Each structure stands twice: as C-alpha cells, then as structure tokens.
Amino acid sequence: MNCQPAPGDDGFHRRIGLFTATMLVAGNMVGSGIFIVSSDMSRDVGGGGWLLVLWLLTGLMTVLGGLCYAELAGAFPKAGGQYLFLKEAFSPLWGFLYGWSAFTVIQCGSIAAVAVAFTKFLGVLWPVLGAGAEATLLKVPMEVSVPLQLPWMPEPVIIFERHFYTISTGQLIAAGIIVLLTFVNCLGVARGALVQNVFTVAKLLALSLVIVMGLGVAIDWAVVRQNLDGAWVPAIETTRVSRTMMLTDLGPHMAFALVAGAAMVGSLFSADAWANVTLTAGEVKNPGRNMPLSLVLGTCMVIALYVLCNLAYMAVLPVTGNEALASQLREQAEREPGRTAAIYSGHAKELGISQAQDDRVGTAVMDVASPGWGRVAMACGIMVSTFGCVNGMILVTARLYWAMARDGLFFRVAGTLNSRGVPQASLIMQAVWSIVLVFSGTYSELLDYVIFASL
C-alpha cells in the first residue's frame, strides 16, 4: 500500500532529505531529559544495575516502536503521523482523541517542559535568569490539595499539593524561546530544518563530550567498584519502595516493580518524540525510503548514546549520594540563594547521581571532570540541546493540527498554509497554548502531565 502522493498535492513542498529527517528524529528525542532524569530514577530504584535495566528496556521499546512506525510511514507518506495512522487503522474518532490529547497535553506540554528545562540550565550561568528561587518574580500564596482515600489507609493520601503560585524569569524566557522559534518556522520549512540540523549536530557533540569525559578523562575506578558492589542490593530498600509498600499493602518485590515502572516515566520522556518525524511525511523527499530509514537510524543512534551516557555517569559519580548532605545544602541555598553555586561547589562526588544539584547529573559529571569550565561548558551544551529540541517539536507537531483541520476535527483556520507552504495558523495556536502551559507548573509537573497523557 505504497500510495506515494505527487509532490505538492497537499500544498507542502518536499524539501526534507534523509539527513534532515534523521536529525529530526534525533533532535526531537534528545532534549534535557538524558541530562536530568537519571537522578530521579536512581532515587526510585537505588542500584546502578536497575538503572541501566530501565534504560535498556526504554531502548528496546523505542527501537521496536521505531520499526513499527517505519512500516506505517512507508505505507502512508503524508502529513499527519500518529493521527493519520489511527484514523486509517480504526476510525476518525481515535484520530480525534489522539489529536486533541496531543494538542492539550502531549505535544504542547513537551514544548513547554523542554523550554522550561532550557532555563534550568541557563540558571547555571546566571541564576537570576533560571527557574530557581533567585529568579522568582512573583509568588502568590495558594492552597491546593488533592487527597486520595485508599480503602486500607486510615487517612487520605495527598497526591498533589501546592502552597504557592510563582512566576519566574525563566518562565518568561521559555515563553520567549517558543515565540522566537515559532516565528522562524513560519518563514518556511527550509529555515526551520536548517536550525534543526545545526542544533542537533551540536547537541550530539555535547552528549558525546559527556561520554568521553566520563568513560575516559574522569573515570574513577573506586566509584566504579562501589557502583558494581551496590548494583542490585539496595533495590527494595529505597524510600519510595517503602512508601509504596505502606500505601498499597504490596510485598517488597511487587512494590519495587511498581516503583521501577513509575521510574521509567523519566527515561520514556527522554526517548519520547521519535515518531514526530512522521508528521512531516508530506515534506520528505522519497518518503517511502527516507521515512523508515530515518526512524531506524535516529532511534538506534540516540538509544546507544543514552546507554553510554549513563555508563559515563556511573563511572564518575556514585549512584547513591549523601541524602543528609543534600538536604543540608538545599536548606542553606534557600537561606542564601545568591550563593547557591558556592554552596554546592566541590560536593558533586558526595551528592552522587541520586542527590545531584537540581538533578543536573550531566553538569555534575563535567564539574568533576573539569572543575570550573566543565560545569559551564555542560550547561551551554544542554542549552543548545534543549533549544534544538524545542525547534524540532515546533516544526513537526504543527503538521498534526493541520491534518486534523483538513478533516474537520480541529479549528478550520489551522488547515491553511501561508505563502511559504507552512501551516502558520497551526504554528501560532500551538505556541499560544504551549506558553499557557509554561506558566501552569514546574518542569517535573509538566513532565508528569506529558507522560501520563502519552501512556
């Protein structure tokens, strides 16, 4: 069923080659997650062995998904991606449900989360421009609490709680990035693709730098032995496993399985968005060949880099860090926000992966490898990575809403193209809602929204 449309039969121009399509796959996958989420995951599962198992499972799921989508993309080489596949395979209702969940949470939420992540690392260079306490512009008291009464618990469990609503400089900058990249992509797919290629190559170099520094320059064999000795032992002894046992009345092994599954939220988020390139199938040259090939090449390359990156983390930092020290440093930083960098300086090894400052494991590794410039270089590299990731998502996902609008399932104006052959109205709508989500919560909250809706 290789019904390849004639170039331009839907108004799009086929200007994306194999290299750019592969860079779109890799660029959409590699954002901020790989440099952050291993910290939270290690707090869940404890041992480095389990941490690697979760990343390998994520890799297996991603590559298998990429192979499936490669077949679908070859069969339906038109704009629309997952929406088109669901509509053709089942019914327009399934396409409608997916498309609107993508707009309200999955895709726009991902754009918002990665734009906010950019400012987390901007805060390494200039704290007042980041997302920390020193960058807060507005803090309004509010009491929001969502309880959940479990039959076996005498008291309800609080599953969401917030005491303040804050607006930071970082959120304003994140909104500005979304506006800037939306404008660039309104100028034509060639402009957006050029930005994507440049920033994807740069981010892959940054990821490679972490791997080289961790597995070569800064490898600490004492830390490696420590991580190997504790690879599996602490698996059912983490705080979160204990809490899960208390809340669910499960045994330790079942509780750990539940926590480990929840921990994969982070790795799945880091490997998410690989399928987004299928949204641009109407603009890819020779889509019957280039779409499947770009998906296979992109997913395999990124997953290999992700596993190597985690090995680099564990070659430099102990998986389990000093929780008491981390708590002490956090309290001191809250009292003296202007001295945050000085307070944390020199403690990367003691904090390890699990207690890394603001979960920034990649920065911690570079700080150990080269105190002084390493931390700054890594922050710059991750900012490049997140900037390119935001551009890639903005470029591709607007095509989803265009396809929905053409079928009468989205706002009609989103189904139009401007004089440069791009869905400008769809891009603008996407930008507006993404900015609303930027101001709706923290990075971790946005991440939870996205993965919950995706699953």
Regions found by a protein language model. Give the residues of each.
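Hydrophobic, small-residue-rich membrane helices and short re-entrant helix-turn-helix hairpins
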Residues: D9-G11, L187-T200, A271-L305, A405-R406, ...
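Membrane-interface loop-to-helix entry segments
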Residues: T169-V233, L295-C300, V450-L455
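TM-loop-TM module centered on a large, flexible mid-protein loop between adjacent transmembrane helices
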Residues: L84-F85, S91, V124-M142, A231-G251, ...
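Membrane-interface "cap" regions at the ends of multi-pass membrane proteins
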Residues: M1-S39, R43-G48, T62-L67, K78-A79
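Juxtamembrane helix-boundary/capping and inter-helix hinge elements in multi-pass membrane proteins
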Residues: R43-G47, A75-G80, E88-W94, A281-N290, ...
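Hydrophobic, membrane-embedded alpha-helices of multi-pass small-molecule transporters
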Residues: I16, T20-G33, Q171-L181, E237-L305, ...
